[in-house]
Swiss-Prot record:
Subcellular location(s) per record: Cytoplasm
Gene: efp
NCBIfam families documented for this protein: efp, PRK00529.1
GO CC aspect terms: cytoplasm
Gene3D superfamilies: 2.30.30.30, Nucleic acid-binding proteins (2.40.50.140)
Source organism phylogeny: Bacteria, Bacillati, Bacillota, Bacilli, Bacillales
Xref: InterPro entries: Elong-fact-P_C, NA-bd_OB-fold, Rib_uL2_dom2, Transl_elong_fac_P/YeiP, Transl_elong_KOW-like, Transl_elong_P/YeiP_cen, Transl_elong_P/YeiP_CS, Transl_elongation_fac_P
UniProt family annotation: Belongs to the elongation factor P family.
Alphabetical GO biological process terms: peptide biosynthetic process
Cytoplasm listed as a keyword: yes
Function, as annotated: Involved in peptide bond synthesis. Stimulates efficient translation and peptide-bond synthesis on native or reconstituted 70S ribosomes in vitro. Probably functions indirectly by altering the affinity of the ribosome for aminoacyl-tRNA, thus increasing their reactivity as acceptors for peptidyl transferase.
Keyword terms of this UniProt record: Cytoplasm, Elongation factor, Protein biosynthesis
Pathway: Protein biosynthesis; polypeptide chain elongation
UniProt-recorded name of the protein: Elongation factor P
GO molecular function, one term: translation elongation factor activity
Length: 185
């Protein structure tokens, strides 16, 4: 058990029969009344975000999440196949389980598979990935100084707003948490 006063971003807890990751939290001490902790939690099974308020000092169960390094192999219909890099066991995940992460997955990419007891609850990507631009408008000479952006489609189908100097065939570094352009590789 862990006190809500010890909440940290990224902490995984069990509340109301679900497994949640703390996305954001705020300790509130009103002038009148008892202190409380306002939190924003992400359900690791469904991806839904919920705001929940706890009384200060309340205890919640900490969820023990194990991670395994696995390699993404291929898509088989709406199933995606991953291989354990040590035991060579294969694991299939449904498209709905990894909907957000699909935009960043490339074949042979190493990812962290999150397991709760024996249940696979999702994957954790690296902070950034390198994706190749397959479609974008050509930049016009002189546009690099203006600081604007244009849309670019990557090899995974993700559309990223990029600076005008980025061309088709360039490799981009993309932030996996929000899908934003970081730099050229």
């Amino acid at each position: 058990m862990i006190s809500v006063n010890d909440f940290r971003t990224g902490l995984t807890i069990e509340v109301d029969g679900g497994i949640w990751r703390v996305v954001d939290f705020q300790h509130v001490k009103p002038g009148k009344g008892a202190a409380f902790v306002r939190s924003k939690l992400r359900n690791l099974r469904t991806g839904a975000i919920q705001e929940k308020t706890f009384r200060a000092g309340e205890k919640v169960a900490r969820a023990q999440i194990e991670t395994k390094t696995m390699q993404y192999l291929y898509a088989n219909g709406d199933q995606h196949v991953f291989m354990d890099t040590t035991s060579y066991e294969q694991l299939e995940l449904n498209e709905k389980q990894i909907e957000h992460e699909l935009k960043f997955l490339l074949e042979n990419m190493s990812v962290q598979i999150m397991m709760y007891q024996t249940e696979t609850i999702g994957i954790e990507l690296p902070n950034t990935v390198e994706l190749k631009v397959v479609e974008t408008e050509p930049g016009i000479k002189g546009d690099t100084a203006s600081g604007g952006t244009k849309p670019a489609k990557t090899e995974t189908g993700l559309v990223v707003n990029v600076p005008f100097f980025v061309n088709e065939g360039d490799t981009l570094v993309v932030n996996t948490s929000d899908g934003s352009y970081v730099s050229r590789a």
